[in-house]
Amino acid sequence: DEVKKSIFWMLFITIGLTLAAIFDGLNNQDMTEPKNHLLEFNPMKYNTYQKGQCTYYVFDKVREDHHQIANSWHDTKDWAKNAKKDQYKVNQHPKEGAILQTTEGKYGHVAYIEKVNDDQSLYVSEMNFKKPYEISNRTIPANDVDQYQYIHPKENQHIS
């Protein structure tokens, strides 16, 4: 009988914690217009890209800006194509906070645009341009800017 009670309470607590983890619950900070976040998924909550790679770094930079990109675009050589499929703006017009993308190399590469300089060169930050886990910065000369695609992250509507 004591074993059954213990099992019941462990199961009850486990289910409660699981539900709390699945649902962010109700956000009633603004009581004039309470917003229900049940079943609402924040695509930026978990970075599923491989640590130490350019994709992982760029995902985190976009998240810091309270913007969003998909966590399922795979190799960077496919990011522009996959972003277009997901209704993201992809073009050859760089902007601060956008993602520079190239198909060069075996897997391609992405970098985060920190600044568009007055001379139209780009100051970018990136990871794994030189080696895994290494964050570096460089300037893309203005005459090379048209060699890349630029993915423009969306506003993240899922943050409270």
Give the positions of each predicted feature:
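N-terminal secretion targeting segments of exported proteins
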Residues: 1-39, 155-160
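Structural motif
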Residues: 58, 116-118
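Secreted/periplasmic proteins that engage bacterial cell-wall peptidoglycan
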Residues: 30-110, 126
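Aromatic- and glycine-rich peptidoglycan recognition patches
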Residues: 118-160
